[in-house]
Amino acid sequence: MPRALKRALSVLAAAVLLAHLPAGQAAAARPTLTDGFGLTQVTSAASTAPTNTDNNFVITVTSAQVAGQQNIRIILPSDYAGNPTKRYPVLYFLHGSPDDPSASFYGNDVLAGAPGMITVVPDGGNRGWYANWLDQNTPAGAANWENFHIQQVIPFIDANLRTIATKQARAIAGVSMGGFGAFRYAQRHPGLFSQVGSLSGDLELGANQMTLRLAVVASLTNVSGALCGSSSGTIDCDDDSYAPGVDSDALFGSPYPVFNADWRWNEADPVANAEKLRGMGIHIYIGNGDGGNYDIREWWLESASAHMKTKLDSLGIPVHYENYGNGATWGPYCQGGGHEPGCWYQDLIDLMPRLRSSLTPAS
């Protein structure tokens, strides 16, 4: 779907949502957020864009943990302003690569239409991979993405918005690179999240899944196109999105399985850490890309998702697993079951009610 069309659809969806709000809510002012936890708000084109509304807006922040300005999309339930004492569960939704929370993305209106829940889409960089990079001295600058999200964004949101700041009221999910990030954060911080979801996620980085590992390496080194195998599809993959290139060792050290030099990659493999998800609600969505225009990216990711399900099953850990194949029976938006926004949109239509029914309800 062309980017311009996505933006137009996002604007239209926002207008429709506002048109159906009660007058008092439609006129309500956007919450004022206070700097803190290492985050400083700055004015940017994204934070002042005319597409921002009082219930769906972008703020831009700076942090010593990550280089440059970072966008954070905040989506409030329609009754937020009209109920000043009501508190809400939160979904942290992690985008893919290369992408940006300020872009008009596939699930904006689904997330915006979710009653009783706050959704936060934090910047993960074009290829941040939701980790603190091993090498902090690359041309890309500071890249402590995990610190940024876990130690700064989450407490900033809890301090500024009426959240229910407990594990049982907090979910994390993501698409592609963001699916990897969601599982990684859930596994490393099980005390923070009670629900985790992956939409076409990169769920396996072990040595037996070298194709996906090398796709990550391609994004680091700025190989032409970087396979766009992790792409969420809302940014042109030919616009040098992965510049400047950095060394293949920058993220988790050597990615090459020689004399166990790649041990950090194996340690970061979500499949290898499946046991750490015990007790959480787990949701995995994947296609096979075999719906006409064959999408080999989703085929690779299908294998990773299947391995995750097999590992969870072997551990006796329940998982809601949707493999919709070529997408023919998944829903009208998923054409071909590929690595593309229509299928993720359909995934969110299924996922959001599941999260709402599992999280501590707004009250």
Q: Residue ranges of each PLM-predicted region?
A:
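Non-catalytic cap/lid and distal C-terminal segments of serine-dependent acyl enzymes
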Residues: 26-363
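Secretory targeting and sorting signals
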Residues: 1-29
